[in-house]
Amino acid sequence: MSIEQTFSIIKPNAMKKNAIGDIVSMFEANGLKIAAAKITVLTTAKAEEFYAEHKARPFFGELVSFMTSGPVMLMCLQGEGAVLKNREIMGATDPKKANPGTVRAKFGDNVGENAVHGSDSPESAARELALFFEKHEICNV
């Protein structure tokens, strides 16, 4: 496997639980390094742009509302096979179905408020990273 970059969001519900340190420790313990990070509150426009693929879905409005409800932590994670590794660390989308010890099993509340987002492919990672970070903001760690 090669060194990759992937995009990750710690969502508002996990931020409210003060879970940043625990979640970042899980990434680092599994060989992922933080190449960029920022804490912000997403605007409605940015959340709608990020989740544009879900615009026609019935949950879109609720998703945008949740993602703009409080601070999020945006990260570029880097490491060997980072996209897949991050998805394994996160666990299943539904926290009830996530393996014990995964981020979503520990900090997710339900399918919508599942603590974290992670890119599902290298192509998605590139698109998502470009949406939130300038090239000069991402370090090669």
Swiss-Prot record:
Chain sites annotated for binding ATP: 11, 59, 87, 93, 104, 114
Active-site residues (renumbered): 117
Keyword Magnesium: yes
Source taxon at top rank: Bacteria
Cofactor entry: Mg(2+)
Predominant subcellular localization, coarse grouping: cytoplasm
Any GO MF annotation of the entry: metal ion binding
Enzyme Commission (EC) number: 2.7.4.6
Record text on subunit structure and interactions: Homotetramer.
Protein name: Nucleoside diphosphate kinase
Organism lineage: Bacteria, Pseudomonadati, Bdellovibrionota, Bdellovibrionia, Bdellovibrionales
